[in-house]
Design a protein with these regions (language model features):
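Short glycine-cluster motifs
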Residues: 83-141
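Beta-strand/loop-alpha-helix module characteristic of Rossmann-like adenine-cofactor folds
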Residues: 126-175
Length: 175
């Protein structure tokens, strides 16, 4: 995991920066500061991220990093880090790498011994758990598969757990 020297960022560092879920004003001052100092910001959807950048006058270059190009761009991103560039990873909402792109790049950074510094912030999982009334153990599942057969198989497994279960459903699928 990454580090700070004094209050300055280290070169060749990569930051995982949670973004607001719903209300742009929920972002932290520290997140804004690091985003402004980043050479590149890897984001899921540049159209969505641009709204956040404009709101807080962040001029760093946005590079798309989504499930369709994440593997293809991996060597480019690692090369930027090797050239002492500061890269921040954000998602459209919440914490990157949790049911969002980012895990592939994190794994590669760990293998390459490139510092990773996660910032605390919004997480849909912790937000859901804190208002559920179940404060003890829980199991985070992620998104359900798209095929009903796979959903049924997964539900068989999940019903065997002795804990609360948190899962995501796309807003497009909720009716």
């Amino acid at each position: 995991i990454g580090r700070l020297v004094g209050s300055e960022m280290c070169i060749r560092d990569r930051y995982i920066i949670p973004t607001p879920i719903g209300n742009l004003r929920d972002i932290t001052y520290r997140a804004i500061e690091i985003l402004k100092k980043s050479d590149f910001i890897l984001c899921e959807d540049t159209r969505i991220s641009r709204k956040l950048m404009e709101k807080f006058d962040i001029k760093s270059k946005l590079l798309p990093n989504h499930k369709f190009n994440e593997k293809k761009n991996l060597s480019l991103f690692i090369n930027h880090l090797r050239n002492d560039k500061i890269i921040s990873l954000i998602s459209d909402a919440g914490t990157p790498g949790i049911s969002d792109p980012g895990a592939i790049l994190v794994r590669e950074c760990v293998e390459e011994k490139i510092n990773i510094f996660p910032l605390p912030g919004p997480s849909a999982v912790s937000t859901a758990v804190c208002i559920s009334g179940f404060s003890e153990k829980y199991f985070f599942y992620g998104f359900f598969p798209s095929k009903m057969k796979d959903i049924k198989n997964d539900l068989k497994f999940l019903t065997q757990l002795n804990s609360s279960i948190v899962f995501f459903i796309s807003p497009k699928k909720v009716n």
